[in-house]
């Protein structure tokens, strides 16, 4: 494994000790987030009014609004929490960037992404991985049902077609089935989007690709959730399972998703996330809360990802218990990866060479501040233009 390059920038809160200036900075960040989110929601409303007749164009517009939201979040993070982002991945084939010969990671167009859940900002960093894979507009996230009622954001997330669950399988099964079947059919050009000649936009970008982000642990790691997880292990006679840095994963929802998406699914990615500086005895979700990250500038200096790819034919779906044991094995390997991470400050590969050459590569980057600001400004301008067209149409 190559050692990551040194990368350190400072957020706006770290550049001044003046409380008044910091207060103005917090106000700036809040205004930027609210105005950006509002422009995205108004843009979505315009799409609903102006493009109800074209499902392809409407979906492309929704995908663009998804991209705008993750660009907005990344631009704000670049200002307040400019972490070094280190992506380490296993591959049995060379992956090349179009601009140079160095290997670079990219999610496949139709994939499920599973990860350990340490803090509430995990999903932002995973969405960023999809964004740099040119799939930022094709992300789907499974969330708590209560989140769909958040003012402004809830409306936007419902338009994003995020999946909201109540953690009651009898209630959730139908909603989950409808969402997954629709994603699968559209990806295979057999769904609602196939009333048209192509499932691709003029730029040949897949309208119906999907990156489904799931957290099998169900919640983020904390003292309370750890105690609940250990109590469940005892009740389920899983006392032999000793996870030092993770919670026991739930397999039912993941197996259901894999089965429903199997006809179109390209790969399942297992992403292990590590944050530093953090001690093995600390709970990252307590140390780096959303409030601390966005309003106080308390953030991880490094965010490390270790990514493994599983092909669908490698996943045992024939039996619930066999699938759970497979997932548990993946989680034990993740736990060892995190143990090595806390010992050495970087992920150490435990890849096995089974008749193929496994290459482990690390790439270090940031939030690419040189391109984020022009991009979000272009989104603002485009949204403002479309809103103006909408207003003029209503007046006439």
From Swiss-Prot:
Membrane topology: Multi-pass membrane protein
InterPro entries to which the protein is assigned, alphabetical: Acyltransf_C (IPR032098), Plipid/glycerol_acylTrfase (IPR002123)
Chief location of this protein within or outside the cell: membrane
Sequence intervals crossing the membrane: 27-47, 69-89, 123-143, 372-392
Stretches assigned to coiled coil: none
Similarity annotation: Belongs to the 1-acyl-sn-glycerol-3-phosphate acyltransferase family.
This protein's domain notes: The HXXXXD motif is essential for acyltransferase activity and may constitute the binding site for the phosphate moiety of the glycerol-3-phosphate.
Name of the protein this chain belongs to: Uncharacterized acyltransferase YDR018C
Organism field: Saccharomyces cerevisiae (strain ATCC 204508 / S288c) (Baker's yeast)
Upper lineage: Eukaryota, Fungi, Dikarya, Ascomycota, Saccharomycotina
């Amino acid at each position: 494994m190559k050692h990551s390059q040194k990368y350190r920038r400072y957020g706006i809160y770290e550049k001044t000790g003046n409380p008044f200036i910091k207060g103005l900075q917090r106000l700036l960040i809040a205004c930027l987030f609210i105005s950006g989110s509002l422009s995205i929601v108004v843009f979505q409303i315009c799409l609903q009014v102006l493009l109800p007749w074209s499902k392809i164009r409407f979906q492309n517009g929704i995908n663009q609004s998804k991209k705008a939201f993750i660009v907005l979040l990344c631009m704000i993070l670049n200002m307040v929490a400019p972490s070094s982002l280190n992506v380490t991945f296993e591959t049995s084939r060379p992956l090349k960037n179009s601009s140079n010969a160095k290997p670079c990671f990219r999610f496949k167009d139709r994939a499920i992404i599973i990860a350990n859940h340490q803090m509430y900002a995990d999903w932002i960093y995973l969405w960023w991985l999809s964004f740099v894979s040119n799939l930022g507009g094709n992300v789907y996230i499974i969330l708590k049902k209560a989140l769909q009622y958040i003012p402004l954001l809830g409306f936007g997330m419902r338009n994003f077609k995020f999946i909201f669950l109540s953690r009651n399988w009898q209630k959730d099964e139908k909603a989950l089935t409808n969402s997954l079947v629709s994603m699968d059919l559209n990806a295979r050009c057999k769904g609602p989007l196939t009333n048209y000649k192509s499932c691709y936009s003029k730029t040949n970008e897949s309208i119906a690709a999907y990156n489904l982000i799931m957290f099998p642990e169900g919640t983020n790691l904390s003292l309370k959730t750890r105690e609940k997880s250990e109590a469940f292990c005892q009740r389920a006679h899983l006392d032999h399972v000793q996870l030092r840095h993770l919670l026991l994963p739930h397999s039912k929802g993941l197996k259901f998703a894999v089965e429903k998406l199997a006809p179109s699914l390209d790969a399942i990615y297992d992403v292990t996330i590590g944050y530093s500086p953090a001690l093995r005895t600390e709970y990252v979700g307590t140390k780096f809360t959303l409030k601390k990250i966005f309003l106080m500038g308390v953030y991880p200096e490094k965010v490390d990802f270790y990514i493994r790819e599983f092909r669908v034919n490698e996943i045992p779906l024939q039996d619930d218990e066999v699938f759970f044991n497979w997932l548990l094995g993946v989680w034990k390997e993740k736990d060892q990866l995190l143990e090595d991470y806390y010992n050495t400050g970087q992920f150490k590969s435990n890849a096995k060479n089974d008749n193929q050459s496994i290459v482990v590569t690390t790439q270090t980057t940031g939030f690419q501040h040189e391109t984020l600001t022009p991009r979000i400004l272009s989104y603002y301008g485009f949204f403002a233009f479309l809103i103006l067209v909408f207003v003029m149409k209503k007046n006439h």
